[in-house]
A protein has these predicted regions:
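Alpha-helical transmembrane segments and membrane-interface helix-loop junctions
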Residues: 1-198
């Protein structure tokens, strides 16, 4: 169990730091997204002429918000779950079931990692240029010049998958430690501000 705890502590600290930064960026992305959508509604219905880039900008914010918040929700148990069977099982059975589901999730995440990189970020679409989003002040960056490269949007999926893999490995280690009787040595991951469906 000492080896597992030695693996868990650095990973837990890394996830704490990375997910805290991701949360701040995700909240900023949400604020930008809301402002862009409200601005688009205002310009469309009041001035009868909405800028064409606001929709794509809002989508950009939504993708990054989702990619950065999904790992935090996964870690804190914030996803919707049907846990009747888990609650009906004894503690060891519930932990084994949770461990099996986390291993299946890990396998799915590894497949998604490949798809996120090869089918989105490093694909023909990902290498393309945005139709309407441009860098401010006419700045030219890379092969797309003043337009955003699509990779900046599609990278949200791949970054989110990487963070989900880190969280999944941490949760697997925590379940293994629980099976070995070390549950009392684990810190509680549920945030105080995390809403639940209980």
């Amino acid at each position: 169990m000492a080896v597992l705890m030695g693996l868990l502590w650095p990973l837990e600290r890394l996830n704490n730091a990375v997910l805290a930064v991701g949360r701040v960026i995700a909240v900023a992305a949400l604020a930008v997204m809301v402002c862009l959508i409200l601005g688009q509604v205002f310009f469309r219905y009041v001035l009868n002429d909405a800028p064409n880039w606001t929709e794509e900008g809002a989508r950009f914010g939504m993708l990054w918000m989702t990619g950065l918040m999904a790992p935090l929700a996964f870690r804190q148990g914030g996803f919707v779950a049907i846990d009747m069977l888990e609650r009906a099982l004894p503690k060891i059975g519930a932990t084994l079931l949770s461990l099996a589901l986390l291993c299946i999730s890990f396998w799915v995440l590894i497949i998604a990692w490949d798809k996120g990189l090869n089918n989105h970020v490093d694909s023909l679409t990902g290498r393309g240029c945005s139709s309407s989003l441009r860098w401010p002040f006419g700045i030219e960056v890379g092969k797309c010049g003043p337009k955003f490269a699509n990779q900046y949007q599609y990278a949200a999926l791949w970054v989110g998958i990487n963070l989900l893999i880190l969280v999944n490995v941490e949760l697997i280690l925590r379940n293994l430690i629980t099976l070995m009787g070390g549950a009392d040595r684990l810190t509680d991951l549920r945030g105080e501000d995390m809403a639940g469906a209980d």
